[in-house]
């Protein structure tokens, strides 16, 4: 069943930055269409910057259209230079192939087949580019591109303006490769709409032009906004780096905490971008939060929605449990897998061998600058061990969680996860 109001809803959510022909595209989407978005493998996992375009494909699927996710097994060997200050490092074919496999698995999980909806398609542009010779590429694709027009593109001009960097022919040719993707998908799958980030507008319009030249097809392009925070800074990274979708790189607990930390100025906008909550429910939540004193509900809703979407109900429950137990101080109820998540997330740790006493441990782990200060902290009740205030120095075997862990805390926020080796 086609949703005739899809473009209007996407616009009201703030998800449309540029649209090649808003009126014609709205008419075009009145019947089932095929839409694609490309994802180049630049690492072994997608990160939250990929979520908005990936979820956009899901929105089109729910509206009655066929989504196509393209993983760039060929373009990933080159790297998109769009608005990059320096030349990308080239990765080996083996590395890129491994990344393609990882990203494909993540995309399948987030873009599932659903009863009554068009089945999502996953393609790899290495399947057609790998079979094309350089001569064929130059004759069949290159002849349709004007170097004059390519040189005035903003992303190219920025690089040419830097004599210390410039742009290689390899990266200069990237737009031709992405354009060929659109033409191939139009011919093979009937794809008539490409979506992508706002920095992809030049590549998308080039692909539209090539497709029209090669196949005389009417095709469209649409970009999504660059996601920034209210203060204008780029969204999606922390001091520790990117927020990955792979739980081995960013644990579900850290993922959950990231969304809980969303600023009040951003949270309702991010609910419109990242969640499938109806706009009326988001507006009602914002109105309810405006009446509340203290912490808003929206951050909790956002964290719950996104953690369950990416990691599942079980991981959400674990993240909620860890958060609750750390906040309440009932850390003795943490499971060993919970402690492993905390260690993965970068909770400061300390590994020791053999026996020690609490004063020495406080100093060696960095929670106290000297043994005198350590004893003063203990006497003042400022040190907790596994969630309980500790005033005594001796450590007992029974203090160890699962026989090998201690969770020390000084004050409210300074934690050390101590682990006995062996």
Swiss-Prot record:
InterPro entries named among the record's database cross-references: aa-tRNA-synth_I_CS, aa-tRNA-synth_Ic, Rossmann-like_a/b/a_fold, S4_RNA-bd_sf, SYY-like_C, Tyr-tRNA-ligase, Tyr-tRNA-ligase_bac-type, Tyr-tRNA-ligase_bac_1
Reactions mediated catalytically: tRNA(Tyr) + L-tyrosine + ATP = L-tyrosyl-tRNA(Tyr) + AMP + diphosphate + H(+)
Positions annotated to bind L-tyrosine: 36, 174, 178
PROSITE patterns xrefs: AA_TRNA_LIGASE_I, S4
Alphabetized GO MF terms: ATP binding; RNA binding; tyrosine-tRNA ligase activity
Swiss-Prot/TrEMBL GO biological process terms: tyrosyl-tRNA aminoacylation
Keyword ATP-binding: yes
Motif interval(s): 'HIGH' region: 41-50
Motif 'KMSKS' region positions after renumbering to this chain: 234-238
EC number: 6.1.1.1
Binding-site list for ATP: 237
Domain of life: Bacteria
Pfam families assigned to the protein according to its UniProt record, in alphabetical order: SYY_C-terminal, tRNA-synt_1b
Keyword terms: Aminoacyl-tRNA synthetase, ATP-binding, Cytoplasm, Ligase, Nucleotide-binding, Protein biosynthesis, RNA-binding
GO CC term (a single one): cytosol
Subcellular location per the Swiss-Prot or TrEMBL entry: Cytoplasm
Function: Catalyzes the attachment of tyrosine to tRNA(Tyr) in a two-step reaction: tyrosine is first activated by ATP to form Tyr-AMP and then transferred to the acceptor end of tRNA(Tyr).
Family to which the UniProt record says this protein belongs: Belongs to the class-I aminoacyl-tRNA synthetase family. TyrS type 1 subfamily.
Record note on quaternary structure: Homodimer.
Entry protein name: Tyrosine--tRNA ligase
């Amino acid at each position: 069943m086609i949703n005739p109001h899809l473009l209007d809803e996407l616009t009201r959510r703030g998800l449309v930055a540029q649209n090649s022909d808003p009126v014609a595209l709205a008419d075009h989407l009145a019947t089932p269409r095929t839409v694609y978005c490309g994802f180049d493998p630049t690492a072994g996992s997608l990160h939250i910057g990929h979520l908005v375009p990936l979820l956009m494909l899901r929105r089109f699927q729910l509206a009655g259209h066929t989504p196509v996710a393209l993983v760039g097994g060929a373009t990933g060997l080159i790297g998109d230079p769009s608005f990059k200050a320096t030349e990308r490092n080239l990765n080996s074919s083996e590395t890129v192939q491994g990344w393609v496999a990882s990203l494909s698995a993540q995309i399948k999980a987030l873009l599932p087949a659903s009863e009554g909806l068009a089945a999502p398609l996953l393609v790899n542009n290495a399947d057609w580019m790998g079979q094309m010779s350089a001569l064929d590429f130059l004759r069949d694709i290159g002849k349709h591109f004007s170097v004059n027009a390519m040189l005035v593109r903003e992303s190219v001009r920025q690089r040419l303006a830097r004599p210390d960097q410039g742009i290689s022919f390899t990266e200069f040719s990237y737009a031709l490769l992405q354009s060929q993707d659109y033409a191939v998908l139009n011919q093979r799958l009937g794809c008539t709409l490409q979506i992508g980030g706002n920095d992809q507008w030049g590549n998308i319009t080039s692909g539209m032009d090539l497709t029209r030249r090669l196949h005389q097809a009417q095709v469209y392009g649409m970009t999504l906004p660059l996601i920034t925070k209210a203060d204008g800074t780029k969204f999606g990274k922390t001091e520790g780096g990117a927020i990955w979708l792979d739980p081995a790189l960013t644990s579900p607990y850290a993922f959950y905490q990231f969304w809980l930390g969303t600023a009040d100025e951003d949270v309702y906008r991010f609910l419109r971008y990242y969640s499938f909550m109806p706009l009326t429910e988001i507006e009602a939540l914002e109105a309810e939060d405006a009446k509340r004193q203290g912490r808003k509900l929206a951050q909790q809703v956002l964290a719950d929605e996104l953690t369950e979407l990416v990691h599942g109900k079980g991981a959400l429950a674990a993240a909620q449990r860890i958060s609750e137990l750390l906040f309440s101080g009932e850390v003795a109820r943490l499971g060993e897998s919970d402690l492993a998540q905390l260690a993965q997330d970068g909770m400061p740790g300390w590994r020791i061998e053999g026996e020690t006493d609490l004063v020495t441990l406080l100093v060696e782990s960095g929670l106290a600058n000297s043994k005198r200060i350590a004893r003063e902290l203990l006497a003042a009740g400022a040190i907790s061990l596994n969630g309980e205030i500790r005033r005594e120095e001796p450590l007992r075997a029974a203090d160890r969680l699962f026989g090998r862990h201690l969770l020390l805390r000084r004050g409210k926020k300074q934690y050390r996860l101590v682990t006995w080796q062996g």
